[in-house]
Amino acid sequence: MTTTVEQTAESHVFEADVARLLHMMVHSVYSDKGVFLRELISNGADACEKLRYEAIETPSLLAADAESRIMLRLDEESRQLVVEDNGIGMRRDEMIEALGTIARSGTRAFMERIAENKAAEGAQFIGQFGVGFYSCFMVAEHVDVISRRAGSEEAWKWSSDGKGSYSVEAANLVEAPARGTRIVLHLMEDAKTYTSRWTVERIVKEQSGHVPVAIRIVDKPGGEPVQITDGTALWTKSKSEVSKEDYTDFYRGLSGQYDEPALTVHFRAEGRHEYTALAFVPGTQPFDMFDPERKGRMKLYVKRVFITDDAELMPRYLRFVRGLIDTADLPLNVSREMIQESPILAAIRKGVTNRVITAIEKLADGESETYLTFWKNFGPVLKEGIYEDYERRAQLMALARFHTSASPEGHRSLAEYVKDAKEGQDAIYYLAGGSLDQLKASPQLEGFRARGIEVLLLTDSVDSFWVVNAPEFEGKAFKSITQGTADLAQFPRLDNQTPPEQDSAGLATFIGFAREKLAGQVADVRASDRLTESAVCLVAPEDGYDRQMEKILQNAGRLQGATKPILEINLAHPVIKAIAAVEDDASYQEDATFLLLDQARILDGERPQDPRKFAQRLARVFERSVRSEG
């Protein structure tokens, strides 16, 4: 075997985003720089788990060293901290990919998130964004990574000072680990404390105490290794043996987040299928929750051997849940295809999903403030289940909380809405749009507010889909207040006013005039019982899409041409009465009619169809008004 290698080191420049990230790390003012150690240990544990998995097919990879471990070596005099694992290791190309580039958007997302938060709070985001390795530059002025892939006859060395470039060269096999990765941190002067056994051991026990790989420490050159954690898998213990702090530490190491879990679900199922599940609902919203791929973050283990974190172990609407499932009912060499098609795993998935939803239901029934925080974080995703999961739709609808016209700043349940509904009200009314402020100012809401009828205010994109897919709740159908007729005549207004008759003061004639002039742009012009303050509004035909749904489909390119809306007119509005009364100036009345349509479009969040004509008509109407006043 060749023990020395003569090869010139290759110099590489970091990607622009990585270079910016490194600059941020080097000049970091994070209050908890010790987070770097948790990240390096977590990476080492992942490498050991990957080796155990590959060794199922290729046992020779383990050779005579089957026990996974992470070794920490301290050298106070040289100001060095070494983190070494005997995991899978890296080839040259893997080293460049893992340490020199970031293929996903984690780097940019991380930096954007940091820009929005105080520096002292930033450490909690490091692992969450997949950039954990770079955190070592918070404490190191230079970093060497020597790695040897299991089963390989080559070893490689990566080096960088974190200032924009790195080098890769072949490593001397005598000095390289027999297998795995050794990270040598040449610490900054003010980071010398990380060569203290007391400091390092405290950090490990606080932040990595439940990593499923034994961790040992050598506190000085030539010293004997001392085990500081035993690598016992926390999920194999009974709940009575695990403290809240233990769960929190494990959750942080597993998820890469630095908050506390809002919910912890830990149980062992026995019977037809035996498995252990440990699932956490995060206390804060993960950055990747709205990733278009909607991938879950649950890990699958078979007999404590990590298999994959890429299986759909939970419904996609629960993708914010972090955790793992460990079962002995699957073979260790289970393939990706077998995982997706396995009836055993389907049964396990169902059982775990039911337990998580039950835990969320208990949270909703008991701790109102805690649940509202949960809902603000995860409600938009959980509502996807109302659309997708027919079996659990009723449960998920009961969990949903909404802003409403009666409680715009609070959160109401559908059960509360139904309980407080007006006598004779057979629908749950809703208004969907882009923002809460826009919805609260919507003209379509006026008639309902005037009659004390509560309306759900829906601002999430998924809302427009599930309200169509969910036929009813407790016998009441969902009805958009921007579609079809309002049918409000049966409900008296709170001020006891009655709407004007259509034929009064020539209003019927004006409606006919407007219907004729706007025939190319609207399906109809009609009197409105939903307007009390605004002059006009747009609504969708009864057999068409809701106004918001139509916009969503158009923006997604899934709708070929929009349907014509209906223009509703408030016959009691002074502007409408004034326009209708000008029967001797058809040109003015026509301009005013088109301006009313453009006004309705603007109120609906749109632009005038023809801005140039809009401006010309507005100028002519202003001119006539000035002349008539003169």
Curated annotation (Swiss-Prot):
InterPro entries: HATPase_C_sf, HSP90_C, Hsp90_fam, Hsp90_N, Ribosomal_Su5_D2-typ_SF. Residues 337-551 are annotated as: B. The keyword Metal-binding does not apply. CDD domains: HATPase_Hsp90-like. GO terms for cellular component: cytoplasm. Residues 552-630 are annotated as: C. Keywords: ATP-binding, Chaperone, Cytoplasm, Nucleotide-binding, Plasmid, Stress response. The keyword Ribosomal protein does not apply. It comes from the Bacteria. GO terms for molecular function: ATP binding; ATP hydrolysis activity; ATP-dependent protein folding chaperone; unfolded protein binding. Gene3D superfamilies: 3.30.230.80, 3.40.50.11260, Heat shock protein 90, C-terminal domain, Histidine kinase-like ATPase, C-terminal domain. Residues 1-336 are annotated as: A. Molecular chaperone. Has ATPase activity. PANTHER family: HEAT SHOCK PROTEIN 90 FAMILY MEMBER. Homodimer. Belongs to the heat shock protein 90 family. This is Chaperone protein HtpG. It comes from Rhizobium etli (strain ATCC 51251 / DSM 11541 / JCM 21823 / NBRC 15573 / CFN 42).
